[in-house]
């Protein structure tokens, strides 16, 4: 039986493609760098933002500046260029009713994650939203989940992580949690299996079916 369920945000609860990729394009443009298409930037959805910029920029030198420029646009515009995946509210309502403790665990800065959860009126489903600090503290998913488990007083052996990228799965496993991967976000089935996901769900409703079986 699972006592607590942790959901990733980007690519699991909401589809943030437009807001994230447009804000990355804005930052790159401000840095006078080549600007890839939005589809070419979807690999950036999920992992810590700074690490994605380090990869794109080829080093650490301007990564912090790129993050700051990204947030110029994201904080005012990109945050809301986002949408909740179909059936997510149904899933959350059902799990809340079945007495599972629900949490958000995202590498996104908590100040933005909180605003997204409030904007889409998802607050009532979650006991707490755990995210990174603006300085990058706890952007690593393993560190974030360790912090969340401790602060929520959750036994990792009775907790489940739901996410769409490998770092969600790896972070959970490092903390002794079970982890389920979803295919409707931005990670591939191969990525999730290789990371060690215990189960793969193609749709949000499949997530509910799987979790309900664990709780019931």
Please tell me what each predicted stretch does.
Residues 4, 140-170:
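Conserved Lys-Pro-Asp/Glu-containing loop-to-beta segment of HAD-superfamily phosphomonoesterases
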Residues 34, 123-127, 155, 198:
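Conserved H-loop
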Residues 76-104, 110-114, 142:
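Short, acidic loop-to-helix structural element flanking the phosphoryl-transfer center
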Residues 97-100, 152-156, 214-215:
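Glycine-rich phosphate-binding loop signature in dinucleotide/nucleotide-binding domains
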């Amino acid at each position: 039986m699972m006592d607590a369920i942790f959901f990733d945000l980007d690519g699991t609860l909401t589809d943030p493609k437009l807001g994230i990729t447009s804000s990355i394009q804005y930052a790159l443009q401000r840095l006078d760098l080549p600007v890839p298409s939005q589809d070419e930037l979807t690999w950036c959805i999920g992992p810590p933002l700074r690490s994605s910029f380090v990869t794109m920029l080829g080093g650490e030198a301007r990564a912090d500046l790129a993050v700051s420029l990204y947030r110029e646009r994201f904080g005012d515009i990109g945050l809301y260029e986002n949408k909740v995946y179909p059936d997510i509210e149904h899933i959350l309502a059902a799990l809340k009713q079945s007495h599972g403790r629900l949490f958000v665990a995202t590498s996104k800065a908590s100040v933005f994650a909180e605003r997204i959860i409030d904007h889409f009126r998802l607050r009532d489903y979650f006991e707490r939203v755990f995210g990174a600090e603006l300085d990058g503290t706890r952007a690593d998913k393993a560190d974030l989940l360790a912090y969340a488990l401790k602060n929520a007083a959750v036994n990792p052996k009775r907790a489940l992580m739901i996410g769409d990228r490998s770092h969600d799965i790896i972070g959970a496993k490092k903390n002794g949690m079970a982890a389920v991967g979803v295919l409707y976000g931005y990670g591939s089935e191969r990525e999730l299996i290789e990371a060690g996901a215990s189960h793969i769900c193609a749709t949000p409703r499949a997530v509910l079916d799987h979790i309900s079986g664990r709780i019931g």
